[in-house]
């Protein structure tokens, strides 16, 4: 272990020596840049672009380009990047993560690689965690870029598509991680190229990269549409039922936060809902509602997992930042179950139209880099998932903060008394204090205790984060007491007020340890910026969530040896700190394993999504006749239909093929079994294909000109692809839930998901081609409707296509439930196009 640690340290030192060598080369240009006039310095941007076009690489331009930005920042902002900031900028340009402590000037560091990469003209995205930081950084640092002749855009959620397109077309675009993800999804749902807003994804520089790529890695971005609200009563009934249960009726697994009915709970459910067997297959939907109601009532906690807004909306609380996640909803019906629990209006369930995780969103960029003050603990994940190294950058000045040993109390009450007493003592002498909590509930509790003690303070949590930047900026003033939920206010520096250094600087008090060491380090890092004095002190109790779930047995044994009897007794020990860190490492390992599994599942969706989106983009951007593609779909559809009956009795096979042709290819009376008898399969395929081509030509002849034909082809394909893809996403979600249960049968659920997901994807492609074929062959095309179709294209519901086949199944040939479906899929009619008829 010692040898491994020594090797890691040596590698870091070697990397720093390389960075320092390049940084010195950047610094060697300083005098030359000082001597340039403003006009000459600004002219360097055009010079760099020309040199890049002639074949110089960005790496060759780096020393001089970085030097230009340093000098520009000095003239425009009065700020001159230090050597360590140059080193951080080099790491960012290389597509890695410089670990730079709080207050070391990460925002200024980013200007150098952002400028250099913008020279290539392919766009640079600077990603922040909220719109306040995007706007602030774009406004402040944008002055430097604009002065140097580069365009800067800000992409905000409230902007129109035209404004977003303008922002993305700038050399440098500031955006939040969620908005850039949603724009990507929306771009892959439009029907016209002019409605797209993004350019190809080139270089993303992510601020607070650990928050986005680690903490939110499992968070999917979902674009969805509403479905029927008839299920609301089921949510309410399930909620009423679980509220009748006692603790013996359900079983909770504390470490995994899962819950299920016990035998007595099952008996009560069968009695309550008048069932003979709760787990009969026809009750699958009901068990889903009950499971969600159990989770909502006994796992999800008010003011910890979610809050209820003043207007009665359930808002998710981000467990890592303490902020509410506006616009986000728990998936799979859990949000509706919580709404039923809290007695607020139940919003309609939604159907997913498109989704992507941050892991796969940001891996699509040609180059990805990020900044943070705390990433070394997650180095393995950054390397394995994102192919990014973590390079610790030295501080410009030595760290003067004093990190005190943790204090452990037997109970929550004794711990909070000690916290209040510490705050009171420090506040009396005027030392500013930042009290960090992991939950809204805890911050409210401490606030009440400070009010009782007569200590004025500010509270910063998920309920009032709109003021967070202002509150955090004042947290370093003399006498300030600030309670902050977790890392609320992250991204805003706490600067010390007058006379505070003499009082010991900012004191950070942690009210419990977080599951992640990184989050604790972030809290500590709010104090002692740029060599300022400061202190940090963590208060723990045996009743803390981390201790209760992961560390209590060992630590209790340790405390038994210490003879911890009285409630206010406090333990201060280095061994305790090691035990706590060991518990945190176990949790971090569990969380990493979970994120890895999410990625394995999502990679299946990613591969399929990339195929669909690439083909979709080809259709949208095509300025040509899509006839060859549609004809190929028609041919494959015919081939599949004929092949599906290759092993059937010949008479039955011919009858089935004729049924397929009549319903999907040609006018009903224009084909009979008689003309196909005696032909081989290949001959049948060719005969049907030639008939289909003739009808295809007839259909297109009804359109006015080539422009109308291309538009019709595009809308036809996109409408069907989008409908099938939406259904496929839901089917994959259901498959994922189903294969999760197979782990109990010793099957690898990920392998099963990959295999079945691939087969489902192939089936979807076949279904798309079948629907394109049938609609192309059977549509009634009205030229006079073309203009209206163009206007409504974005809804993917063109008015120039009306299927000749009525939705009424009486218009279909009579097919029995268990016969082969006439579409040629090979499935039984009841499991294919007859499903709606029989449901």
UniProtKB/Swiss-Prot annotation:
User: What InterPro entries does this protein's entry cite?
Assistant: Helicase_ATP-bd, Helicase_C-like, P-loop_NTPase, SEC_C_motif, SecA, SecA_CS, SecA_DEAD, SecA_motor_DEAD
Stretches for region Disordered: 780-839
GO terms assigned for molecular function? ATP binding; metal ion binding; protein-exporting ATPase activity
The protein's location, in the record's own words, is: Cell membrane; Cytoplasm
Compositional bias, Polar residues, is annotated for 791-809
Top-level taxon of the source organism:
Bacteria
Annotated coiled-coil positions are: none
Subcellular location, principal: membrane
> What cofactors does the UniProt entry give for this protein?
Zn(2+)
Q: How is the cofactor bound?
A: May bind 1 zinc ion per subunit.
Family listed: Belongs to the SecA family.
In its UniProt entry, what is this protein called? Protein translocase subunit SecA
């Amino acid at each position: 272990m010692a040898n491994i640690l020594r090797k890691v340290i040596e590698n870091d030192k070697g990397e720093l020596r390389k960075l320092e060598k390049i940084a010195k080369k950047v610094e060697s240009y300083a005098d030359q840049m000082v001597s340039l006039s403003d006009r000459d310095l600004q002219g360097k941007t055009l010079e760099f672009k020309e040199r890049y076009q002639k074949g110089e690489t960005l790496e060759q331009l780096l020393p001089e380009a970085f030097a230009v930005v340093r000098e520009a920042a000095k003239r425009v902002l009065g700020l001159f990047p230090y050597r360590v900031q140059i080193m951080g900028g080099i790491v960012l340009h290389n597509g890695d993560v410089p670990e730079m402590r709080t207050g070391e000037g990460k925002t200024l560091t980013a200007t150098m690689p952002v400028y250099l990469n913008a020279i290539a003209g392919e766009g640079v995205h600077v990603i922040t965690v909220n719109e306040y930081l995007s706007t602030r950084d774009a406004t402040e640092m944008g002055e430097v870029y604009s002065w140097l002749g580069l365009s800067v855009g800000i992409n905000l959620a409230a902007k129109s598509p035209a404004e977003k397109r303008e922002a993305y077309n700038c050399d440098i675009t500031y955006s939040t991680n969620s908005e850039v993800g949603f724009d990507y999804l929306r771009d892959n749902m439009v029907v016209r190229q002019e409605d797209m807003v993004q350019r190809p994804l080139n270089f993303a520089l992510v601020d607070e990269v650990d928050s986005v790529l680690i903490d939110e890695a499992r968070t999917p971005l979902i674009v969805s549409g509403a479905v029927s609200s008839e299920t609301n009563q089921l949510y309410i009934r399930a909620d009423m039922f679980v509220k009748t249960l006692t603790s013996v009726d359900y079983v909770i697994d504390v470490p995994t936060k899962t819950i299920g009915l016990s035998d007595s709970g099952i008996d009560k459910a069968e009695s309550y809902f008048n069932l003979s067997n709760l787990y009969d297959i026809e009750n699958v939907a009901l068990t889903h509602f009950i499971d969600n109601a159990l989770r909502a009532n006994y796992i999800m906690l008010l003011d910890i997992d979610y809050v209820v807004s003043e207007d009665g909306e359930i808002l998710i609380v981000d467990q890592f930042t303490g902020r509410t996640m506006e616009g986000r909803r728990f998936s799979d019906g859990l949000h509706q179950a919580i709404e039923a629990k809290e007695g607020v209006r139940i919003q309609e369930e939604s159907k997913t139209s498109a989704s992507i995780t941050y892991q796969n969103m940001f891996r699509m960029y040609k180059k990805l880099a990020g900044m943070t003050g705390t990433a070394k603990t997650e180095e393995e994940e950054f390397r394995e998932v994102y192919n990014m190294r973590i390079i610790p950058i030295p501080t410009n000045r030595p760290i003067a903060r004093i990190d005190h040993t943790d204090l452990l109390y037997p109970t929550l009450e004794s711990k909070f008394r000690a916290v209040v007493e510490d705050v009171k003592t420090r506040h009396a002498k005027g030392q500013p204090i930042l009290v960090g909590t992991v939950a809204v509930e805890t911050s409210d509790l401490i606030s009440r205790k400070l009010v009782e003690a007569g200590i004025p303070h500010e509270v910063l949590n998920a309920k009032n984060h709109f003021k967070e930047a202002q509150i955090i900026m004042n947290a370093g003033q003399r006498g300030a007491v600030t309670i902050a939920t977790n890392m609320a206010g992250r991204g805003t520096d706490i600067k010390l007020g007058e006379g505070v250094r003499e009082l010991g600087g900012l004191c950070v008090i942690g009210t419990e340890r977080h599951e992640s060491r990184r989050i604790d380090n972030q809290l500590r890092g709010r104090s002692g910026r740029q060599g300022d004095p400061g202190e940090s002190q963590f208060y723990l109790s045996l009743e803390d969530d981390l201790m209760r779930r992961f560390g209590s047995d060992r630590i209790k044994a340790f405390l038994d040896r210490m003879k911890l009897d009285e409630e206010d007794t406090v333990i201060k020990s280095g061994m305790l700190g090691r035990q706590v860190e060991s518990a945190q490492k176990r949790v971090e390992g569990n969380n990493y394993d979970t994120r890895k599994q999410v990625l394995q599942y999502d990679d299946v969706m990613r591969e399929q999504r990339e195929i669909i989106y690439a083909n979709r983009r080809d259709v949208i951007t095509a300025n040509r006749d899509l006839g060859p593609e549609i004809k190929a779909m028609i041919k494959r559809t015919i081939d599949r239909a004929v092949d599906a009956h290759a092993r059937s009795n010949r008479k039955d096979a011919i009858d089935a093929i004729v049924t397929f042709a009549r319903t999907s290819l040609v006018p009903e009376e224009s084909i009979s079994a008689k003309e196909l008898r005696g032909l081989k399969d290949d001959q049948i395929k060719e005969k049907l294909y030639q008939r289909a081509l003739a009808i295809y030509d007839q259909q297109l002849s009804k359109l006015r000109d080539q422009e109308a034909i291309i538009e019709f082809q595009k809308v036809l394909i996109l409408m069907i692809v989008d409908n099938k893809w939406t259904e496929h996403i839901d089917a994959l979600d259901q498959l994922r839930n189903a294969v999760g249960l197979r782990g109990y049968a010793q099957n690898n659920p990920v392998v099963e998901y990959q295999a079945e997901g691939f087969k489902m994807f192939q089936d979807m492609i076949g279904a798309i081609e079948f629907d394109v074929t049938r609609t192309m062959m059977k549509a009634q095309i009205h030229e006079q409707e073309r203009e209206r179709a163009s206007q409504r294209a974005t809804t993917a519901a063109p008015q120039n296509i009306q299927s000749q086949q009525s939705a009424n199944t009486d218009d279909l040939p009579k097919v029995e439930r268990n016969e082969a479906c006439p579409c040629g899929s090979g499935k039984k009619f009841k499991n294919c196009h007859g499903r709606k008829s029989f449901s």
